[in-house]
């Protein structure tokens, strides 16, 4: 099941269990995880993309190792809310996650990377460290937005 509605996604999830947030780029996939009570999201890691089968294997290992029950995938919309070419590729990526057998929430990721980068600059994180952590931190920002919407 793939949806853009947080209530539908929440209804498809078992009670409890961790969620994973994904910030899908052309070169990397930023990964974040939340606690089983859906209170807070934390950056986890960045997967360097190769081919989709390798990406799927890495995500299968994550799902199994972290007991993930649902995925929140950042959806890159244009500023006016319309689809962009990246939106279509992200929707295709989400459809290709079907072998994982998990519900998928496509969540608006507008401003996520910019907000995270501003926070890192304000915290005086070096440019090298920002580059290392930006994708997983953006995934945490996306995931936190989704869990906040589900637990209101």
Curated annotation (Swiss-Prot):
Q: Name one GO cellular component term.
A: cytosol
Physiological role: Could be a nuclease involved in processing of the 5'-end of pre-16S rRNA.
Name one molecular function that GO assigns to this entry: nuclease activity
Question: Which Pfam family is one of this chain's hits?
Answer: RuvX
> What EC identifiers does the entry list?
3.1.-.-
Q: What is this protein called?
A: Putative pre-16S rRNA nuclease
InterPro entries recorded for this chain? Answer: RNaseH-like_sf, YqgF, YqgF/RNaseH-like_dom, YqgF/RNaseH-like_dom_sf
Gene3D superfamilies listed in its UniProt record = YqgF/RNase H-like domain
Does the keyword section mention Nuclease? yes
One of the protein's GO biological processes:
rRNA 5'-end processing
Q: Where in the cell is it found?
A: Cytoplasm
Keyword annotations from UniProtKB, A to Z: Cytoplasm, Hydrolase, Nuclease, Ribosome biogenesis
Protein family according to the UniProt entry: Belongs to the YqgF nuclease family.
């Amino acid at each position: 099941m793939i949806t853009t509605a947080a209530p539908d996604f929440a209804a498809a999830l078992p009670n409890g269990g961790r969620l994973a947030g994904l910030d899908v780029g052309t070169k990397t996939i930023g990964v974040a995880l939340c606690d089983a009570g859906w209170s807070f999201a934390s950056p986890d890691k960045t997967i360097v993309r190769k081919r989709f089968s390798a990406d799927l294997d890495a995500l299968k290992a994550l799902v199994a190792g972290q007991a993930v029950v649902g995925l929140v995938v950042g959806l890159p919309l244009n500023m006016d809310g319309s689809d962009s070419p990246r939106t279509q590729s992200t929707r295709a990526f989400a459809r290709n996650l079907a072998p994982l057998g998990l519900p998928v929430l496509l969540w608006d990721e507008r401003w996520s990377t910019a907000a995270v980068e501003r926070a890192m600059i304000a915290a005086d994180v070096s440019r090298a460290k920002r580059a290392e952590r930006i994708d997983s931190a953006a995934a945490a920002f996306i995931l936190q937005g989704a869990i906040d919407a589900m637990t209101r």
